[in-house]
Design a protein with these regions (language model features):
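Positively charged, Gly/Ser-enriched RNA/tRNA-binding surfaces
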Residues: 1-32, 42, 76-255
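Glycine-rich, mobile lid/loop segments that gate access to catalytic sites or pores
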Residues: 36, 40-47, 52
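Short acidic alpha-helix initiation/capping motifs at coil-to-helix transition points
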Residues: 36-39, 67-73, 122
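A generic structural motif
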Residues: 37, 60-62, 252-255
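Acidic, His- and aromatic-enriched active-site or binding-groove loops in soluble protein domains
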Residues: 52-80, 166-168
Length: 255
């Protein structure tokens, strides 16, 4: 897991740095055909508000989040039969999340909805800023995409959301997902601690690395050059020795 937690506030720049780190990590491992798909839940909630569906927004997002697994027809059926939307509302939602094109084209289409809902406008500004910063972090254009189908089914996400796909392995689903959570810490403390983070599905990732022959010596490096096995309860000598080894550039670990 990778998380950044703010004290009181957390700049939107961090929402871009998280996927930039994933880009650097995946690239360093030799992966090339991957895509970080990005959306913003404020955009989705704001759009549902325009349709008069604020109270149903959670159910709608959890349903839309399944679209890659069950397809748009089944999503529409659930929205109408279970969530109790009208045919017109369901069609409007499917039309909205089907907006596609280059990042610039999708953002231009979203801009046409601005001015009708404050939450949507805020989400649009956040999403636009994240996309701009990703370019500044050096993330290649082909490796990130605005994707309005990305919702993340967990309700604690409040803004930016991500899923990462390995394009040659669509059957394994997302290998890296996460997003912005402004209010999650309120269950544990009175302090406002907004955060943004992402988790890597290690099992899925290592399967692909193995398939592509990328589990080389560089990725199998031992965690230490020297493993110290103290034979007494007094660790003073072992700690001192480990310190001297580290001062000489060796990675020493106490067992």
């Amino acid at each position: 897991d990778i998380d950044v937690i703010g004290d009181g506030e957390l700049d939107i720049m961090n929402d871009a740095e998280i996927p930039a780190i994933i880009y650097d990590v995946f690239s360093a491992m030799g992966l090339k055909r991957f895509q970080i798909r990005i959306n913003n839940r404020r955009v989705l909630n704001g759009f549902y508000s325009m349709l008069g569906l604020t109270e149903q927004s959670g159910e709608i997002m959890r349903t839309v989040d399944k679209i890659e697994k069950i397809g748009p027809d089944m999503v529409r059926a659930i929205l109408v039969d279970d969530v109790k939307l009208t045919d017109e509302q369901a069609d409007e939602i499917l039309k909205f999340i089907a907006i596609t094109g280059t990042n610039e084209e999708v953002l231009a289409a979203l801009k046409g909805y601005c001015g009708r809902d404050e939450l949507f406008d805020r989400g649009y500004e956040e999403l636009s800023t994240v996309i701009k910063y990703l370019g500044g972090f050096g993330v290649a254009q082909e490796n990130f995409k605005v994707d309005l189908t990305i919702a993340r089914g967990l309700d604690y996400y409040t803004g930016t959301v991500y899923e990462t796909a390995l394009l040659d392995y669509p059957q394994i689903g997302s290998v890296c997902s996460g997003g912005r959570y402004d209010n999650l810490a309120e269950y544990y403390t009175d302090r406002k601690l907004p955060g943004v983070g992402i988790s890597i599905g290690v099992t899925r990732l290592f399967y692909v690395l193995g398939e592509q022959g990328l589990l080389n010596d560089a990725l199998n490096t031992a965690p230490a050059d020297v493993l110290l096995l103290p034979m007494t309860e007094d660790l003073s000598f072992a700690v001192s020795l480990a310190t001297r080894l580290r001062e000489r550039g060796l990675r020493a670990q106490l067992y």
